[in-house]
Amino acid sequence: MAQAQIGTPLLTTRQAEELHKSILAYLSSKNLASTAATLRDELPDLAEVTFDTEKAKKYEGLLEKKWTSVVRLQKKILDLESRNTLLQSEIDNATPSSLSRRTQDPTNWLPKAPPRYVLESHRLPVTCVAFHPVFTSLASGSEDYTIKIWDWELGELERTIKGHTKAVLDVDFGGPRGGTLLASCSSDLTIKLWDPSDEYKNIRTLPGHDHIVSSVRFIPSGAAGAPASGNLLVSASKDNSLKIWDVTTGYCVKTILGHVDWPRAVCPSHDGRYLLSTGSDKSVRLWDLAGGRDAECRLVMFGHENYNLCCAFAPPTAYAYLAKLAGLDRPPPLGASAEFMATGSRDKQIRLWDGRGNCVKVLVGHDNWVRGLVFHPGGKYLLSVADDRTMRCWDLSQEGKCVQTLTGVYEGFVSCIRWAPPVVKDADAMAANTKSGGTGPLADTVVAARRRAATVGSVNASVQIRCVVATGSVDGTEGKVRIFAN
């Protein structure tokens, strides 16, 4: 009977070589020459290894970084185990009424005060936030020139990213098949790409705009004429242009002109076919990317009386509610995109538009500039934040009635709002993602499932709404990020 092999290696040959080089670099940095020489003698793969300047920089401090990463991971595991024990205790001792609160329908969940966490570290106002599509990571950008990465589940700061030389104005996660990237844009006229799988290393800088870059978004794959890999990024700038970039090459593949003043915000439709842009010329423009080389401006909408600051496409889950506002006999097909849109402005108003360019509703209630908008994934609500220090929730099933106003939570202007992407419950997809470390083709299963859910306009059995909202604000002179969660 064959015996089990003893000492089966846990690392691949390449991983072992990298570990050996890291140990050698560590010993060399500590001036332990004899120990390093002994290691070279006993490990054949190190015999010919020499460290030039570039290679030394690559391995310098790598062992320490890996060690501290393991320590942080162990702490997270302990914290999660503690939370799991607490939740299990709550379930064991729960009454039927408390269980019903726990299992409330996520399509009706709205953020409540107080927030779960108030995250403090930025020295100046927070301008933007973005959720990682898979992990519990949140990026925030600030006028202090930095990006900070938080674990929103634990309420902890993970790292500070430096690279921009002026205010960071927008951030977004996305990217090509095989790995999620973080994109950022700034008043320094550049867009930067960061790799979350490599300690958020700056892998590319995209110059090309001639003025402030105020908005950046990854374009979902599936657009007609767009690569299936999802490697396109759109940006908006004070140079009056929109630009589309290929993040794998760093080249600008399309410049879109039409705005006569600063297009402050841009967002793509869920299928990547359309772009919505708006800004200081008070116009709202709908662009069709299906035409190939040139983007076609399908609609130009006017109605706001001051600069427009934000825009959003309605998800298909909202079509049934918005169709009634638009006076339609039946809602558009769930597979359609760009059927309804929302914009917010310095005129303190939010306007809802249909796909024919008609303003179907004006939402009035904010007392100052409307800075950010996000549709509830369930489609029933629209959330907004403004310089009046409030977050408002508008019920689209009640003709856009404001059904909730969060006051007393913020000490200053509220600049941005994002909703966490849904959870993929499919066991195979999650297992695949875990094995691939959140990158690679297996991880794409998770992202693809979310896109399918958006396309069909409903949250199916394998995709669940995540009741987590993040906002950014200025409190005094400092910026704060607030996490609202169920």
Curated annotation (Swiss-Prot):
Against SUPFAM superfamilies, the record matches this protein to: Lissencephaly-1 protein (Lis-1, PAF-AH alpha) N-terminal domain, WD40 repeat-like
The identity of this protein, by name, is Nuclear distribution protein PAC1-2
Cellular compartments annotated: Cytoplasm, Cytoskeleton; Cytoplasm, Cytoskeleton, Spindle pole
GO cellular component, alphabetical, reads: cytoplasm; microtubule; microtubule associated complex; spindle pole
Give start and end residues of every WD repeat: 121-162, 164-204, 208-255, 258-297, 303-363, 365-404, 446-485
**Subunit comment for this entry?**
Self-associates. Interacts with NDL1 and dynein.
Provide the gene name from the record: PAC1-2
> What's this chain's function?
Positively regulates the activity of the minus-end directed microtubule motor protein dynein. May enhance dynein-mediated microtubule sliding by targeting dynein to the microtubule plus end. Required for nuclear migration during vegetative growth as well as development. Required for retrograde early endosome (EE) transport from the hyphal tip. Required for localization of dynein to the mitotic spindle poles. Recruits additional proteins to the dynein complex at SPBs.
Q: Which Pfam families does the entry link to?
A: LisH_PAC1, WD40
Native source organism of the sequence: Sordaria macrospora (strain ATCC MYA-333 / DSM 997 / K(L3346) / K-hell)
